[in-house]
Swiss-Prot record:
Its EC number is 2.1.2.9. This is Methionyl-tRNA formyltransferase. It catalyses: L-methionyl-tRNA(fMet) + (6R)-10-formyltetrahydrofolate = N-formyl-L-methionyl-tRNA(fMet) + (6S)-5,6,7,8-tetrahydrofolate + H(+). The keyword Protein biosynthesis applies. The gene is fmt. GO terms for cellular component: cytosol. SUPFAM superfamilies: FMT C-terminal domain-like (SSF50486), Formyltransferase (SSF53328). Attaches a formyl group to the free amino group of methionyl-tRNA(fMet). The formyl group appears to play a dual role in the initiator identity of N-formylmethionyl-tRNA by promoting its recognition by IF2 and preventing the misappropriation of this tRNA by the elongation apparatus. The lineage of its organism: Bacteria, Pseudomonadati, Pseudomonadota, Alphaproteobacteria, Caulobacterales. Belongs to the Fmt family.
Length: 308
């Protein structure tokens, strides 16, 4: 089929790659404009943009797909279908309906649970045991369209947003290729989403990232893993030179009791409002990520230290 692909982050690259490998004609890739990245804050193309250029696929990076000129250019592509994976813009009806067979989205949750921007993080933070990825027909409503296909994924006890991201990206890439084949053959079945059980995965705000040790231990643990590696749940560690910000990147709940926010041993077991959390991987401000053992070799944290 002749397709357009609209996507931006790493999550979308594997889907684009497998669509190309499956032999579909990708007429154009749309991605968010180049943004400052890295320590030098240089303008760099998105991961999807970079991949498309490496394969010689034309790329457009409009500031808004609502621009009448962009809508007309999209229509002029003469598409069979459009595939959208974490593009980063809400698409107008004129764009969604331009392809002959419609526009289809790969979404990283089991709809109608976790419609919105941050389904991977919210699923972990909420303690969901199972999530997944689905292909749906796009409508003007936010992630409200009928579902064509589903792949379920269990959330492991030490799952982080990074590990779940990679598993769902792989599942979604395979699923969209299978679903496009069904659409082309006229065999795709569309199932309306349930009206009950709707939840929204709001965008992660910076103020959410600070750890509140007074919350129950399981909740603190899920927050740490759900925000790892970005933006990273963080706390302040007192030092002789003043407080230092430390990100907690991996943790595990333990059935131990002690004052909330206080280290209960010399191996980064921290008391919470209920139970305790063992920090397994951390990142001190200005340094790279480290396993707890390596971190403690350079920064002693004895029992009784109050984290804030």
């Amino acid at each position: 089929m002749r397709l357009a692909f609209l996507g931006t982050p790493d999550f979308a690259v594997q889907a684009l790659a497998e669509i190309v490998e499956a032999g579909h004609e990708v007429a154009c890739v749309y991605s968010q404009p180049p943004a400052p990245r890295g320590r030098g804050h240089e303008l760099r193309p998105s991961p999807v943009h970079a991949y498309a250029e490496s394969r010689g696929i034309p790329v457009r990076t409009p500031a808004s797909m609502r621009d009448p000129a962009e809508i007309e250019a999209f229509r002029a592509l003469g598409l069979d279908a459009a595939v959208v994976v974490a593009f980063g813009q809400i698409l107008p009806r004129e764009v969604l309906e331009a392809p002959r067979l419609g526009s289809f989205n790969v979404h990283a949750s089991l709809l109608p649970r976790w419609r919105g921007a941050a389904p991977i993080q919210r699923a972990i933070m909420a303690g969901d045991a199972v999530t997944g990825v689905q292909v749906m027909r796009m409508t003007e409503g936010l992630d409200e369209g009928p579902v064509l296909s589903t792949a379920t994924v269990r959330i492991d006890a030490l799952e982080t947003a990074a590990t779940l991201h990679d598993r769902l990206a792989a599942a979604g890439a395979g699923l969209i290729v299978e679903t496009l084949a069904q659409i082309a053959a006229g065999r795709a079945v569309e199932t309306p989403q349930a009206e009950a059980g709707v939840t929204y995965a709001k965008k992660i705000r910076p103020k959410e990232a600070r750890i509140d040790w007074t919350r129950p231990g399981p909740e603190v643990d899920r927050k740490i893993r759900g925000l790892s590696p970005f933006p990273g749940a963080w706390f302040e560690l007192p030092t002789e030179k003043g407080p230092v910000r430390v990100k907690a990147l991996l943790s595990a709940f333990e059935d131990a009791e002690g004052p909330a926010g206080e280290t209960l041993d010399d191996r980064l077991l921290v008391g919470t409002g209920h139970g305790a959390v063992r920090l397994l991987r951390v990142q001190r401000e200005g340094r790279g990520p480290q396993d707890a053992e390596a971190f403690l070799r350079g920064t002693a944290v004895p029992a009784g230290v109050k984290l804030s």
